[in-house]
């Protein structure tokens, strides 16, 4: 089984720093959009076993790499907040109310 370890790490970072990203909406659609945008900006890091993800996580001890990934998440969160998908739950609820 091939796994993109960066996807798992980015998801964990998104979950950990969700409150600090100040997203307009935190529905699953918007979270997935942020992850997709972020992952398209980083090089994939494939592993063949979930146990090997620890190496990618260990890279985050390097504050510069950790900060770089957080900046990518913050930029992606800003883009999604500015222009949410039509599938965004908050956007759909607002359209229903109006």
Swiss-Prot record:
Give the source's domain of life in one word: Bacteria
The keyword Coiled coil is annotated on this UniProt entry: no
What phenotype is described for loss of this gene?
A: 10-fold decrease in transformation efficiency.
The protein's matches in Pfam families, at most eight in alphabetical order, are given as: ComFB
Functional description taken from the UniProt entry: Involved in transformation (genetic competence for DNA uptake).
Q: Where are the transmembrane segments?
A: none
Which one GO biological process term can you cite for this protein?
Answer: establishment of competence for transformation
Q: Which UniProt keywords apply?
A: Competence
InterPro entries, per the entry: ComFB
* Name of this protein: Competence protein ComFB
Q: Has the keyword Ion transport been applied to this entry?
A: no
Q: What induces it?
A: Part of the comF operon, encoding comFA, comFB and comFC, transcribed in competence media (minimal salts plus glucose) once stationary phase is reached.
């Amino acid at each position: 089984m091939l796994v993109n370890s960066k996807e798992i790490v980015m998801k964990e970072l998104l979950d950990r720093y969700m409150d600090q990203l100040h997203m307009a909406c935190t529905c699953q659609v918007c979270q997935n959009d942020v992850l997709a945008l972020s992952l398209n900006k980083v090089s994939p890091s494939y592993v063949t076993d979930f146990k090997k993800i620890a190496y990618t996580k260990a890279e985050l001890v390097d504050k510069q790499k950790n900060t770089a990934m957080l900046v990518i998440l913050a930029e992606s969160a800003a883009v999604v907040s500015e222009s949410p998908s039509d599938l965004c739950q908050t956007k759909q609820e607002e359209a229903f109310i109006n």
